[in-house]
Regions:
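Transmembrane beta-strands of outer-membrane beta-barrel pores
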Residues: 1, 38-44, 53-54, 83, ...
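Signature of Gram-negative outer-membrane beta-barrel scaffolds
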Residues: 1-29
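Residues on the lipid-exposed face of transmembrane beta-strands in outer-membrane beta-barrel proteins
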Residues: 22-26, 77-83, 131-137, 151, ...
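Repeated loop/turn-to-beta-strand initiation elements of outer-membrane beta-barrel proteins
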Residues: 26, 31-34, 87-91, 141-145, ...
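Surface-exposed extracellular loop regions of Gram-negative outer-membrane beta-barrel proteins
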Residues: 30-76, 97-115, 230-245
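Outer membrane beta-barrel strand-and-loop segments of large Gram-negative receptors
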Residues: 64-66, 70, 90-148, 158-162, ...
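C-terminal beta-signal and adjacent terminal beta-strands/loops
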Residues: 217-282
Length: 282
């Protein structure tokens, strides 16, 4: 590690930002609520992003922060719909659009001696349109369904560096819980994910899943759970490819997927029961 010699470095930065926000909501009945919000936000670069130290993890790459990074400023408009139905059906859906100026991104380029340099920069303007949904439903006395999902499109524009990139991203995470007699519970979870990539980069999706069994003893005081995470896969493969004018790089990570666990918990004493009422307009 070494720090470039530069006596003119100035690490002081003073800024003022106007951050307005507004919201409105409508409750047509006791099952539906609509929220419309507008907000602004500031995201400042982290110490790691600003750190000018140069790191040489190997003979082909260099990693360095950028002390000249500016904070990114975002505007967001979102419409949220909350629905409460029979059998404890709960649905929350949001549609949003955001615009971000001076968006901070990690990127890479080919430097001297054909070394790939990884750093951070303010990459023009980012546009994002997305839909997210959260569902929870007691379909029967013995069955509970839940799911989280999102899908969106992300666009990066920076004319000075010739960047005009559009990418889709998505996620879907369902779960099933079976409530069986004699205080047995069985369940399964899954997940499919693809994140929005860095500039000039394409990401591959990843998936994971798990199963569990739970049994309560001693009037619910003792709980025993057995969990199996991705039992049929040894690794989760994560891959991304960056294409530059002079070089193309592919990074592949193999994350340990398969694992098993046993959890024991015991509750001492019994507290007083309290009736809790939920304000469904929140």
């Amino acid at each position: 590690l070494h720090l470039p010699h530069n006596s003119t470095n100035d690490f002081n930065n003073h800024n003022s930002y106007l951050m307005p926000s507004a919201s409105a909501y409508w409750i047509p009945n006791n099952k539906n609520t609509l929220y419309l919000t507008y907000s602004t936000s500031i995201t400042r670069p982290t110490v790691q992003m600003l750190n000018p130290f140069i790191s040489n993890p190997n003979s082909n790459t260099i990693r360095q922060g950028n002390p000249n990074l500016k904070a990114q400023y975002s505007h967001e408009v979102a419409l949220n719909w909350f629905f409460n139905g029979p059998h404890n059906l709960s649905l929350n859906t949001s549609i949003s659009y955001s615009n971000t100026n001076k968006i901070i991104h990690n990127y890479s380029y080919l430097g001297e001696n054909n070394k790939v340099i990884y750093t951070y920069g303010n990459m023009g303007v980012g546009h994002n349109i997305g839909v997210t949904t959260n569902l929870r439903w007691n379909a029967a006395e013995w069955l509970m369904l839940s799911a989280n999902g999102s899908i969106g499109i992300n666009k990066l524009e920076a004319a000075d560096i010739g960047l005009n990139q559009t990418d889709w991203y998505y996620s879907f995470a369902p779960s099933l819980d079976f409530l069986l007699p004699k205080q047995f519970r069985l369940g399964m979870n899954g997940g499919l994910y693809k994140n929005a990539p860095a500039p000039w980069t394409e990401n591959k999706h990843i998936y994971m899943y798990s199963f569990y069994a739970n049994k309560s003893f001693l009037k619910g005081r003792l709980n025993v759970s057995i969990t199996a995470n991705s039992p049929f896969n040894k690794y989760i493969k994560s891959s991304s490819t960056t294409t530059l004018p002079d070089i193309m790089t592919t990074q592949t990570n193999y994350i340990t997927a398969r694992s098993f666990g046993i959890n024991l918990s015991y509750s001492f004493g019994s507290g007083q029961k309290v009736n809790v009422q939920r304000d469904r307009t929140l």
